[in-house]
Regions:
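Short acidic, glycine-rich surface-loop motifs adjacent to enzyme active sites
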Residues: 216-234
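Histidine-centered catalytic micro-motifs
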Residues: 225-231, 259-269
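Hydrophobic beta-strand anchors of alpha/beta hydrolase catalytic cores
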Residues: 12, 61, 147, 223-224
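N-terminal active-site segment of His-dependent metallophosphoesterases
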Residues: 1-79
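Extended active-site neighborhood of metal-dependent phosphoesterases/phosphodiesterases
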Residues: 1-6, 30-34, 72-219, 244-257, ...
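Short, solvent-exposed loop/turn segments at secondary-structure junctions
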Residues: 22, 70-72, 232-235, 241, ...
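Active-site glycine-centered loops adjacent to acidic/histidine catalytic or metal-binding residues
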Residues: 17, 65-66, 101-102, 150, ...
Length: 321
């Protein structure tokens, strides 16, 4: 008889940079790349339909940030755009884990986001850093498999009160590293990732991350990490990269449990496998995906590998660990 295929330990949907707005198509800041604001919701609906039809059913969805576009704030449509996106995701009977991106923070302050459906950090607070407005947390996906959600804008001028110490510290970083009049411009920078549309990690979050990975090491767990901004330069274009990415990598490399780091932000997508055997997968963004294509996938985790089945612009991958 044929051997029955081994069932995955866990399966989860992945999607990034939906950036929905009820607006005509536009372009990126460079003016060269088309953005399909209104179509992105239709592509999300297709993704949800596909995930809902999977058998065995998926366990959860990882939404990697920038669910709605920044222009919603100017149009007074932040709330309604978010409700439409969450309404579609809410049709799935499984949890959705959200990373906060720069576009969430163009639309809402951190305090406001904490009262929306994008706040997926578990109630009670013991699962994340001491700062309740830091959207980082961990949870078990299955026996021996943990998810860690990182907040890549913990250190940022976005979504923070200008009087707050966090804002002031982030402003100091930008002033020191970016002499351009426009902090969103990487022009001429030796370190082009020091721009305002990226962010970084507070020491408190890094210390917390280290403790979680220590726990997973001790309990022989494997860990999947997710956050909006890439943290490995080779899973990036050199610009879309967390400010203090080296600090995050050094936490990961001082443990053996992390198998994969998922990110968005870079709409072209990227991938690398580092010298420690960690996979860094940056997903192609829905927002720059033509209406006849798509950009989502499902990752199936087995004992010794993860298999990504991608749709549209996202290629299939086998990632061994």
């Amino acid at each position: 008889r044929a051997d029955r295929p081994v069932a995955p330990r866990v399966a989860f949907g992945v999607i990034a940079d939906i950036q929905f707005a009820d607006a005509e198509d536009g372009h990126d800041f460079g003016g060269s790349r088309r953005r399909y604001y209104r179509h992105s919701l239709r592509l999300l609906r297709e993704a949800v339909r596909a995930w809902a039809g999977e058998s065995p059913p998926i366990d959860c969805v990882l939404q990697l940030g920038d669910s709605i576009d920044g222009q919603n704030a100017r149009r007074g449509e932040a709330e309604s755009a978010l409700q439409q996106v969450l309404g579609v995701l809410g049709q799935l009977p499984v949890p959705v884990h959200h990373a906060w991106g720069n576009h969430e923070l163009y639309n809402f302050s951190r305090a406001q986001l904490a009262h929306t459906g994008l706040y997926s950090r578990p109630a009670g607070g013991s699962d994340g850093p001491p700062d309740r407005h830091c959207h980082a947390y961990h949870c078990s996906l299955a026996a021996g498999l943990r998810l860690v959600v990182l907040d890549t804008y913990d250190l940022s001028t976005l979504g923070r009160d200008p009087d707050s110490p966090c804002y002031q510290e982030a402003l100091r970083v930008l002033q020191e590293k970016n002499p351009n009049e426009d902090f969103n411009s990487p022009a001429g920078l030796m370190e082009p990732h020091f721009v305002a549309f990226n962010g970084g990690f507070s020491q408190a979050q890094l210390d917390w991350f280290d403790e979680v990975l220590k726990f997973s090491d001790e309990n022989e767990e494997k860990v999947v990490v997710m956050g909006h901004v890439p943290i490995h330069p080779y899973a990036s274009d050199g610009v879309c990269l967390a400010w203090n990415y080296e600090a995050a990598l050094s936490v990961i490399h001082s443990h053996r449990c992390v198998i994969c780091v998922l990110a968005g932000h870079l709409h072209d997508g990227a991938y690398c496998l580092d010298s420690h055997g960690v996979h860094y997968l940056t997903l192609e963004g829905v927002i720059e995906t033509p209406p006849e294509s798509n950009a989502f996938g499902t990752i199936y985790v087995y004992e010794d590998k993860m298999i990504l089945k991608g749709k549209g612009r996202i290629p299939d991958r086998v990632m061994h660990f």
